[in-house]
């Protein structure tokens, strides 16, 4: 059986620890350069287009294939 990891006893100490952990991560981050941002945007856009193209191909096959088989 899976044990619940829910922690019902939220204290100010645990909230403070969580905030400190998040702040530590935020201090390590940096704003991406324009070139880095554009590269990430291009890769993400290409991925979205690829998934959309695959979905469209599946849609066309599922709508046209029954017509071809029944003829």
Curated annotation (Swiss-Prot):
It is found in: Cell membrane. Belongs to the SecE/SEC61-gamma family. This is Protein translocase subunit SecE. The chain crosses the membrane at residues 43-63. GO terms for biological process: intracellular protein transmembrane transport; protein secretion; protein targeting. Pfam families: SecE. Essential subunit of the Sec protein translocation channel SecYEG. Clamps together the 2 halves of SecY. May contact the channel plug during translocation. The gene is secE. GO terms for cellular component: plasma membrane. It comes from the Archaea. InterPro entries: Prot_translocase_SecE_dom_sf, Translocase_Sec61-g, Translocase_SecE/Sec61-g. Its main location: membrane. SUPFAM superfamilies: Preprotein translocase SecE subunit. NCBIfam families: PRK09400.1-3 (NF006908), secE_euk_arch (TIGR00327).
